């Protein structure tokens, strides 16, 4: 039986307490994972300075070069996983086995993670706004003719990770280039990615002490967030909400991302159907940057009908099928609860499931696995309960609003793709505090430039600027 250990400052540690993670289809145990209790985590985190000192001994440019090598190791090399060795193909197969994600989608996410490591110089240039990276090495210097000084806010970054999509791991990778050690809590059914990323970086020369890896329970997660000076927390609105006022944490919750078609281009909606489809369906519809809403001023029902017809082509396929676009649910009860929530919303007047006539039932069993088939709902008002919802499958509400209600009616949105030439609407979106990432023009919500901030700027999360003067 494959066993994944805890990593205590890079050193493998097997615990008596283990979690047994099943294969998504057979439900037989696929991997055992050592579990760290809160006491062990708190004890280990009493000394964070030594790991930080080891990273700080390298220049930023040296760490960027290491990450470039690690990108290749992550994609192609055979790396340790517990007492065994894992090829890149093993990683794809194992991740798919515990999460249900099709192999093709795992490989796309692999490329995303590798790409961020390989292009770390560009990523840091974007996050630091072109800061001379030697300033991070010295702690001070001159930027655009002004004296500047930056200091780390923390000795480590604690990260509570999800299981829904491996691509999220690209968000914490830059911490190593910024000389901040990582304390990682993997998702319950996706322990593979953070472990493999760490091993790739260690092989590339990053000190192993920069990586602590603690599979743990709710109490252990709390110990990580409480004892690391800075944190990153992935979860839905209900789990991240209680930390909303904790400035030490960068929260990654429900996205409520949207495609908005301005009134000026509403009659041309068919030109943008591909953008809407890609925004809703890529990565199995499981990302916070997937569009969960299409907001229009006219032609709402026509747009919803066209989307429903296109998405009906997405059906369950074998996980090794290169055309597989839909991920099953590792836990069938989760799929049942989600489908029940959608049905409850549909019982309220003003919403219609336009996918039903194409696909039949939403909740289906196929070859021993449970799926939710793509669902497009036409909603007559932005006040309807389904107007602003997000679920872990390709789901979107097509919402009709009056032109004057945009963008105020949108509510908080991680990504907004605004298809419009209306400068007044563009200006409102640009100045809106509720839009985190803004695309002007027909850009899928899933298309991300990783040198741009994502739900906060990681450099500003990990470093602060101080006033600085030095005598001549």
Role assignments for model-derived ranges:
Residues 1-146, 313:
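N-terminal Rossmann-like NAD(P)+-binding subdomain of aldehyde/semialdehyde dehydrogenases
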Residues 11-16, 152-153, 165-168, 369-372:
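Short, flexible loop/turn motifs enriched in small residues
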Residues 23-36, 60-75, 186, 203-208, ...:
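Conserved C-terminal structural/oligomerization subdomain of aldehyde/semialdehyde dehydrogenase
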Residues 51, 178-186, 290-292, 410-414:
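Glycine- and acidic
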Residues 76, 203, 228-230, 236-381:
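ALDH superfamily catalytic-core signature
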Residues 129-277, 453, 459:
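Rossmann-like NAD(P) dinucleotide-binding subdomain of oxidoreductase/dehydrogenase enzymes
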Residues 154, 228, 246-247, 291, ...:
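Short, well-ordered alpha-helix to beta-strand connector turns
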Residues 197-199, 243-245, 306-307, 428-433:
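Short, aromatic/basic amphipathic alpha-helical patches
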